[in-house]
A protein has these predicted regions:
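Conserved beta-strand-loop-alpha-helix junction that forms the acyl-donor binding cleft
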Residues: 121-137
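Short amphipathic alpha-helix that is part of the acyltransferase structural core
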Residues: 1-36, 51, 183
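Conserved acetyl-CoA-binding loop of GNAT-fold acetyltransferases
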Residues: 135-152
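C-terminal "cap" of GNAT-fold acetyltransferases
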Residues: 149-183
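A conserved beta-strand-loop-helix scaffold within acyl/acetyltransferase catalytic domains
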Residues: 30-83
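Conserved acetyl-CoA-binding loop-helix of GNAT-fold acetyltransferases
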Residues: 83, 89-113
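Charge-rich, solvent-exposed alpha-helical interaction surfaces
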Residues: 18, 22-26, 108, 112, ...
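Short, high-confidence coil segments that cap the C-terminus of an alpha-helix
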Residues: 47, 115-119
Length: 183
């Protein structure tokens, strides 16, 4: 699996089409718990897109994203991560040919966002159980010589309800979280 992190306009049209096909399937089937998150997704609203390909076909993607709510120079990484159905078995949720399939994707995004001199950058997840997140990011930190930490509490990352907007953050240990904590 190869990973490429590009500005939206740098993506090949076939890759944009493949991303849209993955999204369309998720939205039309409504089986993914978060399918509604993809109804208004636009490749062109993202700061950068990372695609994971096998034989030049997109099998997974995620993006670097910012919004007014975050404040200036704050970026969300690993935004809207999806894997195509035909790659779920090959790529699995964890590994592809012995490598954790999304760690390189995350590292490419971390490296890129650092070039922007950000005030803060983060990944977030709606789930409160952090055991697996801590395991993955311990592995990530060792493999890529980084210092990402998983928050002990949840933070408001958007205007909305508690379920969708209060999330666990993964962020650099030396950065100060700019969001209000939940409870």
């Amino acid at each position: 699996m190869k990973h490429y992190t590009l500005k939206p306009f740098q993506l090949e049209s076939k890759h944009i089409s493949q991303i849209h096909n993955i999204i369309e399937k998720v939205v039309s089937e409504k089986r993914d718990e978060y399918w509604k998150n993809y109804t208004d997704y636009s490749v062109y609203d993202q700061t950068m897109i990372t695609v994971s390909t096998i034989n030049d076909e997109v099998k997974a993607f995620s993006s670097i994203y910012t919004r007014d709510f975050y404040g200036d120079d704050v970026y969300r990484l690993f935004n809207r991560f999806l894997v195509s159905d035909d790659a779920r078995e090959d790529c699995g949720s964890k590994m592809y040919k012995g490598d954790h399939r999304f760690l390189e994707m995350i590292d490419q995004q971390v490296k890129y966002v650092k070039t922007l001199n950000p005030k803060f950058y983060f990944l977030s997840r709606q789930r409160k159980n952090t055991r697996w997140l801590r395991w993955y990011f311990d592995k990530y930190n060792k493999q890529y010589n980084e210092n990402m930490v998983v928050s002990d509490k949840q933070y408001w990352i958007c205007k909305g309800n508690e379920y969708g907007c209060c999330q666990t953050l993964i962020y650099p240990k030396d950065k100060i979280v700019p969001f209000k904590s939940y409870k």
